[in-house]
Amino acid sequence: MKDITKQKFSRNKLVEMISFALGNLGHAAFYGALSTYFIVYVTSGMFDGLPQSVANKLIGLITALVVIIRLAEVIIDPILGNIVDNTKTRWGKFKPWQVIGAVVSSVLLVVIFTGIFGLAHINWIAFAIVFTVLFILLDIFYSFADVAYWGMVPAISEDSKERGIFTSLGSFTGSIGWNGLTMIVVPVTTYFTFIATGKHEQGPSGWFGFSIVVSIVAVLSALAVAFGTKEKDNLIRNAATKKTSIKDVFSGIIHNDQILWISLAYLMYSLAYVVTNGVLFYFFKFVLGKPNEFWIAGAIATVIGFSTAPLYPVLNKFITRKVLFSIGQMAMILSYLFFIFGKTNMMMVTIGLILFNFTFAQLVVVLSLTDSIEYGQLKNGNRNEAVVLAVRPMLDKITGAFSNGLVGAIAITAGMTGSATAGDISASKINTFEIYAFYTPLLFSILALVIFLWKVKITEKKHAEIVIELEKTLSSGAKKANTSEVNVELEEIFAPASGQKKLLNEVDGNTLTGIGFAIDPEEGNLFAPFDGKVDFTFSTKHVLGVVSNNGLKAIIHVGIGTINMRGAGFVSHYVDGQLFKKGDLLMTFDKKLITKNGYQDDIIMYFTQPENIIDVQQIDNRVVKQGEKIAKLTFRSER
């Protein structure tokens, strides 16, 4: 049989990957324009020509409205997700919303970057009403595009490795779109302002031109996804997935203290990062007096981002996540000292920017949150995969909303609004700017470090211990399910792989007890042993829980010691909740890599509620073929 792990990407798959990656180039650039530079436009050009006192009141009003609307986005996202999920068209469910969302939000972005055609100069009350309606619509259609873009990954590929590549490529181009915007914003706004007025500055006409450029890129990127990818009507898309509400998220956080502390540490880090990132334009323009060199901030962020992402897995082989998080936070803390004490020296600022962007926080937080799933399962019997997936995006939206509010408040308080220049900003206003832009985020970054070191207990070693203890608990049947109805059922088990069948106590190094069997596999493929569904997967990918259509619950564990590989070499061909048929491919694993790391590759299958099993009939130990009937169980089904 051909080892499926050795398949190479076809030309069509490569086109799909490139098309999908291009989608986030414009999508991320659009988000950058909306979340960061729209507020810059509001404070500097939207109310150009109005008395400063009136302009500041309108800036405050718009800033408050943006914060409220962005916070409301957290609540409506699940609703939009349901709408996308229930869409059925000849083009699929995701691509129509990707294109519609991009086109509508892009048109509305251009409209609000005109100052709604100068309506504020005519009637500011009418302006506030129209702006609120337009911004809500813009935010909704942007969210449609966002939900559709990331939601379509399982529709493109059934292979977890491929899905990981799609996601990584999307994140890569997203970084280019986000940081590339920082590099072009000043040249583009200056160019279009010069074309319209003959002045070398960032005026309203320049911001209008900037919005057109961003909108065109966003629409073209969405079209690349629509025409370059193909949605598949596969089992993964039809997996039964429960929608996660905001109530579910907060409930999951409250009942799992590690999710709580990891989330709080990330919230502090994210607040520091987004606030400082949001005011860097003002820093270059009003403190340094060098707006034309603002592109350096984007260039540094791009280079450092490209370096730290591939560097993380290499460093993590020798350095723990907690240490890597600490290194990143210490670098961020030092960066603020360079910004504060070297604010007039471009070299010092450059060093500060390098340190500011040298962080592993997002990677560490994602992995730590993922590991907290097994912690919660061991602690209270609840797995919160959906909650964990929703936590970081929710926190990003919350911090993004507050960032918009803080940036607007900082600009007004420090007098960095309207046609003000660096020469108009007094020393006292610069001090005010520093308090909010640097000292306050410095405090947030210190709190993030303290919380993570003091309260976060999920390390790689601790997680390995939790997984081992959890498997022992599951195999012994220590945690009993709640019984609402009990039926006696019969289930036939078919070999999930070809190889030598063994008893559990015949596997060297196996500490699992209970009822089950093991197979020394001939190949690195794992197939479904009966008709049923995937209940859950450990974050280390080497263990999955399955349940038959008759209610028989089992754990399939690949390898002894493979928990230490942290998922390397394991590729799943399903998502949690997916229904499968006997003989469907569930997983591929690299036998050579497992052996190279000094571990065994035995496939162990055991049943998690042995107290409910009435009778077990197994064939004798011998070489079996995948799909061959090897056991028959009579059990009490709790459903």
Curated annotation (Swiss-Prot):
Subcellular localization(s) per the UniProt record: Cell membrane
Membrane topology of this protein: Multi-pass membrane protein
Domain PTS EIIA type-1: 505-609
Keyword Cell membrane among UniProt keywords: yes
Modified-residue entries (Phosphohistidine), positions: 557
Domain of life of the source: Bacteria
A single MF term (Gene Ontology): kinase activity
Record keywords, A-Z: Cell membrane, Kinase, Membrane, Phosphoprotein, Plasmid, Sugar transport, Symport, Transferase, Transmembrane, Transmembrane helix, Transport
Enzyme kind, highest EC tier: transferase
Entry keyword Membrane: yes
Main location: membrane
E.C. number(s) listed in UniProt: 2.7.1.-
Pfam family, one: MFS_2
Gene3D superfamilies, alphabetized: Glucose Permease (Domain IIA), MFS general substrate transporter like domains
InterPro entries, sorted: Dup_hybrid_motif, MFS_2, MFS_trans_sf, Na/Gal_symport, Na/Gal_symport_CS, PTS_EIIA_1_perm
One Gene Ontology CC term in the entry: plasma membrane
Protein role: Responsible for transport of beta-galactosides into the cell, with the concomitant uptake of protons (symport system), and also for transport of homologous and heterologous exchange of beta-galactosides.
Domain observations: The PTS EIIA type-1 domain may serve a regulatory function, through its phosphorylation activity.
Protein name per the record: Lactose permease
Native species: Leuconostoc lactis
Gene (UniProt): lacS
